[in-house]
């Protein structure tokens, strides 16, 4: 038995209207969104969401940022919203970075009238390359001996004090500056982004770098170890004029995009503001031995999360031999020297900066290196110095003379031979001694002759040179400087007026 529910007329009208509304609401399912559809960015831009976002606690809301660093070159227009800015640089070109004092009145009063130290670094942006940074930089050093990754253009810079560049850290420079005075530093980046790509077949994209600045104030001991502020920005480095072409290409591509597509990208700014980041962790594999004219004091900082801050974990350092204990010092490196003895020899001869590179090298391994090998490994300056040290080469003296002491017996033999034959004889046997002069002065010659005679220099009254017709010419600095190299002289001694002194005659 079938039941049928009879609705009143008014209810039928209501039901019909609800069905039509429901059908209309389902009619859009499966169709593509039109231009007038809502986008998520529009939804998030509604006041209710903005108010909710502003109510969230900000980590840096009450944080004092004492400084601001501005790279005076335009950012790329091809960077999407909510992404970090990207700036293109030309290889070897000088770019200005302005160091601005961002403190409010009364903030950090301990900096008033004081200098601060800033350390500039060019580091990798990609996490993968950060883990192998040391190997990457050593490979670059091998291919570009004598070159640096980062330099300061000192003549163009303003307000920087005591700029320094450690020869073992090619990507780092540092200087002191006064926040109360105008300070602008011009930097040059000499490596290009494509030098660190995995495959180099042409047309590949270069890896991005970061320019990071860490600033420190002076502690109670006068060392700049107390961290104040760190900031960085993302860059790509091209061959000369390549950055200008890339900027122009990005700008032309953006001009061809529709207004809706352009809204997804941030505009190109005239300058690049470095954003706050965590301090760069100390690189532990760098030798603690200071280079000439470079203060190698090291700081250790915790690694934290920050905007654009690389979470860099340096590889553990290789053990360095303590040269002060356990081994008898060796003067010359021998083929039989062990790797430990080779490390000791490197430290004693001021090659500690390269000790890690030669950790497993024995004496034979080092001595087999050619001149080109050590120059490629250590650069031209240190490479030539290491090669000369390995080969035991001494510095050639400025002047070498040979002298022989004329004895009474030889003088009598010569006189007798002359009397018998009527001429000077050459049968006498003379033994000469070499005298090496560096300063080429009369005082230096006096000291060297005194050593030869095993007497005090004060016992030599005057030194003469026998001239034409047997005259005695007083030796002076100018005369010694005009001696021919490897000249030969016979030394004759004459008793001076005083009992304990002598006159020396060079014949």
From Swiss-Prot:
The main place the protein resides is nucleus
Q: Where is this region: Disordered?
A: 240-268, 296-316
- Bias class Basic and acidic residues marks the residues at 241-265
Is Nucleus a UniProt keyword of this protein? yes
- Please provide, in alphabetical order, the Gene Ontology terms of the cellular component aspect for this entry: nucleus
Q: Where is the Grh/CP2 DB domain?
A: 61-300
Q: Which Pfam families match?
A: CP2, GRHL1_C, SAM_3
Region entry DNA-binding, spans: 133-395
Which Gene3D superfamilies does the entry mention? Answer: Transcription Factor, Ets-1
UniProt GO molecular function: DNA binding; DNA-binding transcription activator activity, RNA polymerase II-specific
* Cell compartment(s), UniProt: Nucleus
- Keyword field: DNA-binding, Nucleus, Transcription, Transcription regulation
Which family does the record claim for this protein?
A: Belongs to the grh/CP2 family. CP2 subfamily.
Function (record text): May function as a transcription factor.
Q: How does it assemble?
A: Component of the SSP (stage selector protein) complex, which appears to be a heteromer of TFCP2 and 2 copies of NFE4.
Q: What is this protein called?
A: Transcription factor CP2
- Tell me what organism the protein belongs to: Xenopus tropicalis (Western clawed frog)
């Amino acid at each position: 038995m079938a039941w049928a529910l009879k609705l009143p007329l008014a209810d039928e009208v209501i039901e019909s209207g609800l069905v039509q509304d429901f059908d209309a609401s389902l009619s859009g399912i499966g169709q593509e969104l039109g231009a007038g559809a809502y986008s998520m960015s529009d939804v998030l831009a509604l006041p209710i969401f903005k108010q909710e976002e502003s109510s969230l606690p900000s980590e840096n809301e009450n944080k004092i940022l004492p400084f601001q660093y501005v790279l005076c070159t335009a950012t790329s227009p091809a960077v999407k919203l909510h992404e970090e800015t990207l700036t293109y640089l030309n290889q070897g070109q000088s770019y200005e970075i302005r160091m601005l004092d961002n403190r409010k009145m009364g903030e950090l009063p301990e900096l008033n009238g004081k200098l601060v130290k800033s350390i500039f670094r060019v580091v990798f942006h990609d996490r993968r390359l950060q883990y192998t940074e040391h190997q990457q930089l050593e490979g670059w050093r091998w291919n570009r001996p004598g070159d640096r990754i980062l330099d300061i253009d000192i003549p163009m810079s303003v307000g920087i004090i005591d700029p320094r560049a450690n020869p073992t850290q090619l990507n780092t420079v540092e200087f002191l500056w006064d926040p109360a005075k105008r300070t602008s530093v011009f930097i040059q980046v000499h490596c290009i982004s494509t030098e660190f790509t995995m495959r180099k077949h042409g047309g590949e994209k270069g890896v991005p770098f970061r320019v990071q600045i860490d600033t420190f104030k002076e502690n109670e001991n006068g060392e700049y170890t107390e961290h104040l502020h760190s900031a960085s920005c993302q860059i790509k480095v091209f061959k000369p004029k390549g950055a200008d072409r890339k900027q122009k290409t990005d700008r032309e591509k953006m001009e061809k995009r529709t207004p809706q597509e352009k809204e997804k990208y941030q505009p190109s700014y005239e300058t690049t503001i470095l954003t706050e980041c965590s301090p760069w962790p100390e690189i532990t594999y760098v030798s603690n031995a200071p280079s000439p004219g470079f203060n190698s004091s090291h700081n250790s900082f915790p690694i934290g999360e920050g905007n654009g801050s690389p979470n860099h974990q340096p590889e553990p350092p290789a053990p360095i031999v303590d040269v002060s204990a356990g081994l008898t010092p060796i003067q010359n490196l021998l083929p039989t020297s062990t790797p430990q003895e080779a490390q000791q020899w490197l430290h004693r001869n001021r090659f500690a900066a390269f000790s890690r590179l030669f950790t497993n090298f024995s004496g034979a391994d080092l001595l087999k290196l050619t001149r080109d090998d050590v120059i490629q490994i250590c650069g031209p300056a240190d490479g030539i110095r290491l090669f000369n040290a390995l080969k035991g080469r001494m510095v050639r003296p400025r002047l070498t003379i040979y002298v022989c002491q004329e004895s009474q017996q030889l003088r009598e033999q010569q006189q007798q031979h002359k009397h018998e034959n009527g001429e000077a004889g050459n049968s006498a046997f003379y033994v000469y001694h070499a005298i090496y002069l560096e300063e080429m002065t009369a005082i230096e010659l006096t000291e060297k002759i005194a050593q030869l005679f095993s007497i005090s220099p004060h016992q030599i009254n005057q030194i003469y040179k026998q001239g034409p017709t047997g005259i005695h010419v007083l030796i002076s600095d100018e005369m010694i400087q005009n001696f021919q190299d490897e000249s030969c002289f016979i030394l004759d001694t004459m008793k001076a007026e005083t009992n304990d002194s002598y006159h020396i005659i060079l014949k």
